[in-house]
Curated annotation (Swiss-Prot):
Belongs to the NLE1/RSA4 family. PROSITE patterns: WD_REPEATS_1 (PS00678), WD_REPEATS_2 (PS50082), WD_REPEATS_REGION (PS50294). GO terms for biological process: protein-RNA complex remodeling; ribosomal large subunit assembly. This is Ribosome assembly protein 4. The gene is RSA4. The lineage of its organism: Eukaryota, Fungi, Dikarya, Ascomycota, Saccharomycotina. Residues 20-128 are annotated as: Interaction with MDN1. SUPFAM superfamilies: WD40 repeat-like (SSF50978). GO terms for cellular component: nucleolus.
């Protein structure tokens, strides 16, 4: 069913007034001198230009496209400016142009109207994702609630789902039919994950085991991986660029039993068991610099060094309740590995490693530093932004949600963070400093998950209210309402090539959405 937006509360009305106060621009604001410089190469475009002091981000984008001769097929850009502190020892700050030049640089005092401002630009993406607008199919097959879903890292033609009927299923999204039913688990399939080379699917179950599958044949690759004493809560693959030559990516699993295990997927042996958490581990992520991050119901996040046999090197303590989820600023690069939006496959393992490392470093560079940032979401209604390689203290405490935060995700370029909460709202935050940007309202029940489009301009959410909604990050508004499911929607994913969105939930139907 289509949902009606509820009337705004007093708090929402107050929040809505804040952006208006920021947007007041002096009438006598003079023109300023700017120049465009490519962030990656340092090349200047067009020399010095005089522009209005209140020029908006969109107008800057139009101007740059004119200078580059791409007005007919405009490229979306992000703009930032580096600010040196008053003392030589002060760190250099990177300020994003998020609204207009005046509110981002001049009003806060970073620049005056007499300065020449160098704007560093970088393309948001090399392609444009269209918002999905319709359900292309509703496919039956699962006999119980669908709990998890994931597109392949290299194509939108293949997708896997896990359900409460003890099976996972691989779907052919081109013909919109089921390909293989993955039978072997004896209880609910709680998590599914594609290896970053697209050659193996891992499933984790409430039967305490993990199984590996061949996505082409649907056959189980050997026996189940056994060792956990309680159910599997999440899975994470070793990034391609860290895999030793001649080896296959290893797999990390987290469990309700409070441990994390590292599995050799060829010999099927558990290499390390990492103990230390005193309660269920809700989420595990394998980072791009040889570290593993885990969030737990013991209210802590732990950082583990895989190169030192899984030794715990940091414990991050700030949350006052369960840690439900965590996301890395490099998640997208780690997911796609050596692929890109075209799905072109490298010809050799060496080429794959090189391309995967390029993808990873490109994301780090876009984010303004070479380190992975991490955001954690909790039952305490808050999130924390961390630089786990530098400090055990958070960069920012992110507050605003009125109920538990269930899901959190960095945008593919690491510039934004989006959070989904049981307070029916989605919030957008700055990925560098954790500052609040906007609230997306429209769902009338708990929001379970969010997924980004690869070009960072759109996101899709799924909710208890039976709908999916597509949001425009630039306008901060609802783009498309997607009714269709007959009950709660628990899982959503957006394919890397941007062509499709998949969803599943309590009505047992897999839905594919396209434009």
């Amino acid at each position: 069913m289509s949902t009606l937006i509820p009337p705004p509360s007093k708090k929402q009305k107050k929040e809505a007034q804040l952006p208006r106060e920021v947007a007041i621009i002096p009438k006598d604001l003079p023109n300023v001198s700017i120049k465009f410089q490519a962030l990656d190469t340092g090349d200047n475009v067009g020399g010095a230009l005089r522009v209005p002091g209140a020029i908006s981000e969109k107008q800057l984008e139009e101007l740059l496209n004119q200078l580059n001769g791409t007005s007919d097929d405009p490229v979306p850009y992000t703009f930032s400016c580096t600010i040196q502190g008053k003392k030589a020892s002060d760190p250099v700050k990177t300020i994003d142009i998020t609204d207009n030049l005046y509110s981002s640089l001049i009003k806060p005092g970073y620049n005056s109207t007499e300065d020449q401002i160098t704007l560093l630009y970088t393309p948001r993406a090399v392609f444009k994702v269209k918002p999905v607008t319709r359900s292309s199919s509703a496919i039956a097959g699962h006999g119980s609630t669908i709990l998890c879903s994931a597109f392949a890292p290299h194509t939108s033609s293949r997708m896997v789902t896990g359900a409460g009927d003890n099976t996972a299923r691989i779907w052919d999204c081109d013909t919109q039919t089921p390909m293989h039913t993955l039978k072997g688990h004896y209880n609910w399939v709680l998590c599914v994950s594609w290896s970053p080379d697209g050659e193996v699917i891992a499933t984790g179950s409430m039967d305490n085991t993990i199984r590996l599958w061949d996505p082409k044949s649907g056959q189980c690759l050997g026996d189940a991986l056994r060792g956990h004493s309680k159910w599997i809560t999440s899975l994470s693959w070793e990034p391609i660029h860290l895999v030793k030559p001649g080896s296959k990516p290893r797999l990390a699993s987290s469990s309700k039993d409070g441990t994390i295990k590292i599995w050799d997927t060829v010999s099927r042996v558990c290499q390390y068991t990492m103990s230390g958490h005193t309660n269920s581990v809700s989420c595990v992520k394998w980072g791009g610099q040889g570290l593993l991050y885990s969030g737990s119901h013991d209210r802590t996040v732990r950082v583990w060094d895989i190169n030192s046999q899984g030794r715990c090197i940091n414990i991050l303590k700030s949350h006052a309740h369960w840690v439900n989820h965590l996301s890395l600023s490099t998640d997208y690069a780690l997911r796609i590995g050596a692929f890109d939006h075209t799905g072109k496959k490298p010809s050799t393992p060496e080429e794959a490693q090189k391309k995967a490392l390029e993808n990873y470093e490109k994301i780090c560079k876009k984010n303004g530093n070479s380190e992975e940032m991490m955001v954690t979401a909790s039952d305490d209604y808050t999130m924390f932004l961390w630089n786990p390689l530098k400090s055990t203290k958070p960069i920012a405490r992110m507050t605003g949600h009125q109920k538990l935060v269930n899901h959190v995700a960095f945008s593919p370029d690491g510039r934004y963070i989006v959070s989904a909460s049981f307070d029916n709202s989605i919030k957008l935050w700055d990925g560098r400093d954790g500052k609040f940007i906007s609230t997306f309202r429209g769902h009338v029940a708990s929001v379970y998950q969010v997924a980004w489009s690869s070009d960072c301009r759109l996101l899709v959410s799924c909710s208890k209210d039976t709908t999916l909604k597509v949001w425009d990050v630039r306008t901060r508004k609802l783009s498309v309402d997607l009714p269709g499911h007959k009950d709660e929607v628990y899982t959503v994913d957006w394919s890397v090539d941007g062509k499709r969105v998949c969803s599943g939930g309590k009505d047992k139907m897999v839905r594919l959405w396209t434009h």
